[in-house]
């Protein structure tokens, strides 16, 4: 389910049960020992628990005399939004990308290593979010878009009244460009690398600079330089 309203997202985060999940590796005399609500794998001498941090701490204190070795792994604290289950997406999701729940990923999209996509964002069919790019909360990315490495599509959750960023179909955003809150980038436009876009970008135009300004209309030469490679989107 896609959440697109800022107040709805804020309420979802407020009401969500905050979680600190841990992975607990334990050796010792573990026969009959369990952690409430946890999933366990292993033997009576060595187990791995997937558990809540607080309950895991209680377990370790209570059974300290029966535990010989312990190792704890965790990657979040009081987290409100889980990661999106990407197993059934018809898209290419590379390792090291972070996609939060309540995000929509279109068919044949490509999410590269280090990319971050926040709650309420939508990624269109055939769109590539390149390495270390960020799509903030409620960001709407159309079809066959390329968001370059390190680029930022600003999120709009706070203040909640702000209009989300909208990137229309066929847009190319160069590396390390920044698209600020409320901006709409028109169809088939090109945003040059390193640009900071503070105003709407007309369809079919090329913008560059800080702040970004229209420098020309997209011509045949620019189209050749910015064309997408379909093979990168094949599954």
UniProtKB/Swiss-Prot annotation:
The keyword Cell division does not apply. One of its GO terms (biological process) is diaminopimelate biosynthetic process. It holds the Pfam family Hexapep_2. It comes from the Bacteria. Keywords: Acyltransferase, Amino-acid biosynthesis, Diaminopimelate biosynthesis, Lysine biosynthesis, Repeat, Transferase. Its EC number is 2.3.1.89. It catalyses: (S)-2,3,4,5-tetrahydrodipicolinate + acetyl-CoA + H2O = L-2-acetamido-6-oxoheptanedioate + CoA. GO terms for molecular function: tetrahydrodipicolinate N-acetyltransferase activity. Pathway: Amino-acid biosynthesis; L-lysine biosynthesis via DAP pathway; LL-2,6-diaminopimelate from (S)-tetrahydrodipicolinate (acetylase route): step 1/3. It is an enzyme of class 2 (transferase). The keyword Amino-acid biosynthesis applies. Belongs to the transferase hexapeptide repeat family. DapH subfamily. Catalyzes the transfer of an acetyl group from acetyl-CoA to tetrahydrodipicolinate. This is 2,3,4,5-tetrahydropyridine-2,6-dicarboxylate N-acetyltransferase. It comes from Exiguobacterium sibiricum (strain DSM 17290 / CCUG 55495 / CIP 109462 / JCM 13490 / 255-15). The lineage of its organism: Bacteria, Bacillati, Bacillota, Bacilli, Bacillales.
């Amino acid at each position: 389910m896609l959440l697109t309203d800022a107040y709805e997202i804020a309420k979802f985060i407020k009401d969500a049960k905050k979680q600190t999940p841990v992975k607990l590796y334990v050796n010792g005399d573990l026969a009959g020992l369990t952690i409430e609500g946890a999933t366990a794998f292993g033997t009576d001498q060595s187990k791995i628990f997937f558990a809540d941090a607080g309950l895991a701490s209680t377990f370790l204190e209570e059974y300290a005399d029966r535990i010989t070795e312990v190792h704890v792994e965790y990657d979040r604290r009081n987290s409100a939004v889980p990661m999106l289950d990407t197993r059934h997406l018809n898209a290419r999701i590379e390792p090291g990308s972070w996609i939060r729940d309540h995000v929509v990923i279109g068919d044949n999209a490509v999410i590269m290593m280090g990319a971050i996509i926040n709650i309420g964002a939508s990624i269109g069919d055939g769109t590539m979010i390149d390495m270390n790019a960020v799509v903030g909360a409620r960001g709407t990315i159309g079809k066959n878009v390329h968001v370059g490495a390190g680029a930022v599509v600003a999120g709009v959750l706070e203040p909640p009244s702000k209009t989300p960023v909208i990137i229309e179909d066929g847009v190319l955003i160069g590396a390390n460009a920044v698209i600020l809150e409320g901006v709409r980038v028109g169809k088939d436009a090109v945003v040059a690398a390193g640009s900071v876009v503070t105003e709407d970008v007309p369809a079919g135009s090329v913008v560059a600079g800080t702040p970004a300004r229209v420098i020309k209309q997209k011509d045949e030469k620019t189209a050749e330089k910015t064309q997408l490679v379909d093979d990168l989107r094949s599954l």
